[in-house]
Amino acid sequence: MGDVVMNERELILAIETSCDETSAAVIENGTTILSNVVSSQIDSHKRFGGVVPEIASRHHVEQITVIVEEAMHEAGVDFADLAAVAVTEGPGLVGALLIGVNAAKAIAFAHQLPLIGVHHIAGHIYANRLLKELEFPLLALVVSGGHTELIYMENHGEFEVIGETRDDAVGEAYDKVARTLGLPYPGGPHIDRLAVNGEDTLQFPRAWLEPDSFDFSFSGLKSAVINTLHNAKQRGENVQAEDVAASFQASVIDVLVTKTKKAAEEYKVRQVLLAGGVAANKGLRTALEEAFFKEPIDLVIPPLSLCTDNAAMIGAAASIKFKQQTFAGMDLNGQPSLELEND
């Protein structure tokens, strides 16, 4: 591979297969989406109440070639037009990651293109750059099925995790509470919709932890909800599902928003970003907007299409690595437990 030519029009083909979405996108100059094709497997996993790794991998194998071709066609570009190929290298399900990584390596090798490995959470954060330019220092609240983190950034590619969950991630707690309420997988959207018609009458606990901590804990809340429902059932009492959803969500949002605002003030950030699958939650989006309405801090909330896993966000994050000439070799591998800091 010769020297990388920095064209005026930097086109990156990005691939995301870390969990149960097969996605490919073409991103121009790190900020413009030319295509973003996503094939979801939710229906295949719904009856199991969660993602089954073996099924996820099989779906990725079936879909990846078609999805990449569709993304290229929709963007109206050929492989010769590309500046690089990017792919999620972790964290995620190892089998699922390998499908995307091997597809990206094959394309990079066949067309002599630079290869860029991207951290999945960096992708979620950089989804916001597809809306507006990032302003540093900034704080990102990352909320998803597997992650709940507050990440401080002083510059591009510099990630400092200042708060994280000590047990369950937010999305995980949502799914478990939803299952107890008899709601289908994934539970987040169902609880969010139910909560609109309920009241915070049950006053579930808030885990604030130590006064100076930005960490989170949701296992106690999850247990409190399950115990409330179990005890009511034993007593033959009827608890309104809407009130359970509203009370659970009120507790989650209270802690997330309060800690985010406190961290934003303490770290004197210019921008706060919302990122991750749970960022699609209407209750959380509204609460953050209300909390930062009068603050001199720019709050950026991505559209729903960029909250859940997609390849456009991977392309946006990869653009920074492309400019820094941070490329991967053909030994790039899927890393299910990849750390974010100093990515």
UniProtKB/Swiss-Prot annotation:
Q: Does the keyword Iron apply?
A: yes
GO MF term set: iron ion binding; N(6)-L-threonylcarbamoyladenine synthase activity
Q: Which organism is it from?
A: Halalkalibacterium halodurans (strain ATCC BAA-125 / DSM 18197 / FERM 7344 / JCM 9153 / C-125) (Bacillus halodurans)
Biological process terms from the Gene Ontology for this record are: tRNA threonylcarbamoyladenosine modification
Give the primary localization class: cytoplasm
User: Which HAMAP family does the UniProt record give?
Assistant: TsaD
> Which residues take part in binding Fe cation?
H120, H124, D309
- Gene name as annotated: tsaD
What EC number(s) are associated with this protein in UniProt?
2.3.1.234
Keyword Iron appears in the UniProt entry: yes
Query: Could you say which protein family the record assigns here?
Result: Belongs to the KAE1 / TsaD family.
Q: What is this protein called?
A: tRNA N6-adenosine threonylcarbamoyltransferase
Catalytic reactions of this protein: L-threonylcarbamoyladenylate + adenosine(37) in tRNA = N(6)-L-threonylcarbamoyladenosine(37) in tRNA + AMP + H(+)
GO CC, any one term: cytoplasm
Pfam families, alphabetized: TsaD
- What does the record give as cofactor? Fe(2+)
Keywords assigned = Acyltransferase, Cytoplasm, Iron, Metal-binding, Transferase, tRNA processing
Identify the residues that bind substrate: V142, V143, S144, G145, G146, D175, G188, D192, N281
Cofactor binding note of this UniProt entry: Binds 1 Fe(2+) ion per subunit.
What is its biological role? Required for the formation of a threonylcarbamoyl group on adenosine at position 37 (t(6)A37) in tRNAs that read codons beginning with adenine. Is involved in the transfer of the threonylcarbamoyl moiety of threonylcarbamoyl-AMP (TC-AMP) to the N6 group of A37, together with TsaE and TsaB. TsaD likely plays a direct catalytic role in this reaction.
Domain of life, per the record? Bacteria
Provide the protein's localization. Answer: Cytoplasm
